[in-house]
A protein has these predicted regions:
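Active-site signature of alpha/beta-hydrolase-fold catalytic machinery across serine-
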Residues: 36, 117-121
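Gly/Ala-rich beta-loop-alpha elbow adjacent to hydrolase catalytic centers
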Residues: 106-111, 115
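Short alpha-helix in the alpha/beta-hydrolase fold that links the catalytic acid
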Residues: 36-39, 158-168
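A conserved short beta-strand
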Residues: 123-134
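Short beta-strand/loop motif that positions the catalytic acidic residue
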Residues: 148-150, 154
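Alpha/beta-hydrolase fold nucleophile elbow
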Residues: 97-107
Length: 204
């Protein structure tokens, strides 16, 4: 039975795309935020990629930007519901033409937490967490390749959050995990884009 899509999204691609990258923006941003990153990642890859950037469902309390769930204070029950809806949406994108195993899921900050929680329950080609953190009681299950990145000067989400993710993945004996730290703040370092591109070519 076909899953239901719960999210609006922006799509950039061609009818002959064979692979897909799905982007999950951070707290207070919108679906357009990561599009430049997505374009840089797929530029001149050996496979034709479609970019899909999902829009978080809720507006922040002040009406500026969107959120996957409330963070101030954090509503972890709302997060669980949001993860469930994201899983449905990701399954909706699991098509015969572009299955999830030919899909990269990339999230930034709150979007990274969502990508890890939802993505590691599915048979994805690659999950990428940028400046992410683990949800409470998160236990990774599906053993797909994972890339982690974090800025050492990040004062929004501390680097220790990604180190905790790595610890949990190693505890579950994940075989294909890469962790990278950069001399930057709460952002996606330009050098990490090259790391992602190399990993995509290696996997696909």
């Amino acid at each position: 039975m076909k899953s239901f899509i719960h999210h609006e999204y922006v799509s950039i691609g061609h009818h002959n795309s064979t692979h897909r990258i799905i982007l999950l923006h951070g707290w207070g941003a919108d679906s357009d935020d990561l599009l430049p990153i997505g374009k840089s990642i797929i530029h001149n890859l050996s496979h034709e990629f479609e970019i899909v950037s999902l829009k978080a469902p809720d507006f922040r309390a002040n009406g500026v930007g969107r959120q996957w769930y409330s963070l101030f204070p954090p509503d972890w029950n709302e997060a669980k519901i949001s993860v469930g809806k994201l899983i449905d949406t990701l399954k909706w994108f699991d098509t015969q033409k572009i299955p999830l195993r030919d899909t990269v899921l990339l999230g930034f900050s709150q979007g990274a937490a969502m990508a890890l929680d939802a993505g590691l329950r599915l048979d994805l080609g690659l999950v990428v967490s940028c400046s992410g953190y683990p949800h409470p009681e998160w236990i990774p299950s599906e053993n797909c390749p994972v890339l982690l990145s974090h800025g050492l000067q990040d004062d929004i989400v501390p680097p220790s959050a990604s180190r905790e993710i790595l610890k949990k993945l190693k505890h579950k004996k994940y075989l294909n995990v890469g962790s990278h730290e950069f001399n930057c703040a709460h952002t996606i370092h330009e050098n990490f884009i090259d790391v992602i591109r190399i990993k995509i070519e290696e996997i696909f």
